[in-house]
Amino acid sequence: MCSSDLDFVAPDNYSLDAKGFAEVCAAYAREDNPFFMPETIGDANMFRAMGEYNCLGNFFFGVEVLLTPEGEVRPERQTTIDSIQCTAAAAPLLLKYQGTGKIHTFIQEDNVPTWEKELDGFSILAEYGDKRAPWSGKDWRHRSPGWMPVPQAKFKAAYGLVFQAQKHEFYFVGANVRFFLRPQLTPQTVGSSVMLGDSISQNFSFIVSVDEGHFDKNGEFVVDRKRNGDEIGRRGFWVEPDIKVLRVITCD
């Protein structure tokens, strides 16, 4: 039975595979039906729902199972906590840019080590996991076991969002990933910029600033930590949930 008072139809989406999850999203994300999921699993697929299908919100059924009776995060639920943290940090960007084509989603799939995308004036390569070199370029808080004598989380899948707000203004949120950014090649520059396996060899003079930060209540970006040196060059721009949002400003 149809009703003129029905605002929208919202699905429960418990599909575990990426294709099945996307099919449910596509079936309900229509111009005549605002897309909301009242029940779903809090995993990396939520980024696909928000970034590709303009999902207005997700409700994680059974969210109380994230914590132990003592209030500690259950290790097997850390990915859900991380995804919530990334989403909260990116909320102002999602509200501003959903439906504009400025949001790009990446989610690691089996046996796929990278993700590539052509943006406005730039090419981007996302490399999943830690860099395969003895030193990854990350700070002491985020390096993998074997290189720093501090406890580190076990391997986790990579996921997140890329926002190109303006041609030279980028925002990144996600987990277990690093990005390599370069101006798109022209016949004049193709000889001086080449992809070499897990890195990009090039001139980095187009990078103006790389900042970790967050958005305040007015939607303004606040810098918490400025990166420099090896953290912004050939080792890429790495992101993890606890750094919130990474902003990269470039120039011609």
What are these regions (language model features)?
Residues M46-T186:
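Aromatic- and carboxylate-lined catalytic core of secreted/periplasmic carbohydrate-active enzymes
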Residues D7-P11, F35-P38, G57-F60:
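Structural recognition of the beta-strand scaffold that forms the well-ordered cores
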Residues R30-P34:
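A short helix->loop->beta-strand "cap" motif at the edges of active sites that frequently abuts
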Residues A133, G137, P149-D252:
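C-terminal functional modules
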Residues G20-A27, N45-A49:
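A short acidic, amphipathic alpha-helical/loop segment
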Residues C2-S3:
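Short, small-residue-biased leader/transition segments that mark boundaries at the very start
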Residues D12-G20, T40-A44:
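Acidic-and-aromatic substrate-binding clefts and catalytic sites of carbohydrate-active enzymes
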